[in-house]
């Protein structure tokens, strides 16, 4: 009962920065160096059993709310409106990642390994603003869940364009996007069945890479009824990758090459996933229940958000991975982080 949410959060953030692989490591490290943890402002350093119980009983949504509150507080440091100024709409990327590469994600099938660490994984579905660098919304599912069922969770807005991969193809969801005047750009599936209605004129297609721009109709099956949905299909040749792409969108008025450029922005979320996996690897879960796994992932996202804000606040240029490594090294040192990072050689220069 005395292990409050604040202490729980600090303990799990310590786990993320120190890259601990077990609850025993988390508890043992903080207890062993308890004299150097005053700046953590912990009211109670947890033992392994205390942390395990808290991960099981404290609702993971609490940590989701903390993440969202931090986003509202520090969001102005993250915004970069250059892209929005060109498109004049909010572009949001929707994608998923499997947190760990091991199978049998939430089920923990089979015997417990000798190491006492259960291998597994969970799929995180993330919405990312193009003019920001951290997730805006997060949902968790079993890895076996089809991606397209998550489209219904997106918020419809006539000032928003969603970008997602063809794994999220769902014609009923596309119909809802059109009804709510919400834009989307995705890739058409290889086996898609459609009827060509009209071919748009392509201007300067050799320069822009647009090979084909046509209006098509697809059949939407819903509640034992079928209806027709009119969309736009663009065939585009990427000179860098030297391959063709076929895009599906409901942006009928936008230039075809601009639609292709919007889809290219989807790579930003891949960079986010790479950043998370490189700097806060989740190779092992510290609990064998869904709630504990979600808490661990939320705390990794909170750590990533805090480091991103620090990076944006600094005038001095720092690589993200170097910032995370620096914090790991100095976890038990009490320093003014921003002041030190602006001039890490200051004390050394004085001595010289």
Where are these regions (language model features)?
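Extended, structured, electrostatic nucleic-acid-contact surfaces
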Residues: 31-41
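Single, function-defining residue in the core of a domain
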Residues: 1-25, 29, 58, 65-69, ...
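Active-site phosphate-binding and catalytic loops of NTP-dependent enzymes
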Residues: 76, 80-81
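Major-groove recognition helix of helix-turn-helix-like DNA-binding domains
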Residues: 40-60, 68
């Amino acid at each position: 009962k005395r292990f409050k949410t604040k202490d729980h959060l600090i303990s799990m953030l310590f786990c993320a920065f120190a890259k601990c692989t077990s609850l025993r490591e988390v508890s043992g490290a903080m207890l062993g160096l308890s004299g150097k943890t005053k700046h953590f402002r912990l009211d109670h350093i947890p033992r392994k059993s205390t942390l395990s119980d808290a991960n099981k009983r404290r609702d993971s949504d609490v940590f989701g709310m903390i993440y969202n509150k931090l986003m509202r507080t520090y969001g102005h440091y993250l915004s970069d409106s250059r892209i929005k100024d060109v498109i004049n709409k909010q572009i949001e990327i929707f994608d998923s990642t499997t947190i760990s590469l091991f199978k049998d994600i939430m089920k923990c099938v089979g015997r417990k390994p000798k190491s006492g660490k259960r291998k597994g994984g969970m799929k995180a579905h993330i919405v990312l603003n193009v003019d920001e660098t951290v997730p805006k919304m997060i949902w968790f599912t079993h890895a076996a869940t089809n991606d397209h069922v998550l489209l219904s969770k997106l918020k419809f807005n006539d000032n928003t364009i969603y970008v997602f991969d063809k794994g999220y193809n769902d014609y009923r969801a596309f119909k809802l996007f059109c009804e709510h005047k919400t834009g989307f750009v995705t890739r058409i599936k290889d086996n898609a069945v459609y009827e060509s209605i009209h071919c748009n004129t392509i201007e300067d297609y050799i320069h822009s890479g647009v090979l084909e721009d046509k209006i098509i109709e697809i059949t939407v099956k819903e509640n034992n009824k079928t209806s027709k949905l009119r969309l736009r299909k663009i065939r585009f040749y990427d000179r860098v990758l030297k391959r063709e792409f076929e895009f599906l969108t409901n942006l009928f008025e936008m230039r075809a090459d601009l639609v292709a450029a919007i889809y290219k922005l989807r790579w930003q979320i891949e960079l986010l996933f790479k950043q998370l996996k490189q700097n806060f690897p989740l190779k092992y879960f510290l609990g064998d229940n869904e709630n504990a796994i979600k808490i661990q992932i939320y705390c990794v996202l909170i750590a990533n958000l805090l480091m991103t804000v620090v990076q944006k606040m600094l005038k001095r240029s720092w690589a993200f991975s170097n910032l995370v490594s620096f914090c790991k090294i100095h976890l038990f040192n009490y320093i003014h982080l921003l002041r030190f990072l602006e001039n890490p050689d200051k004390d050394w220069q004085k001595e010289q």
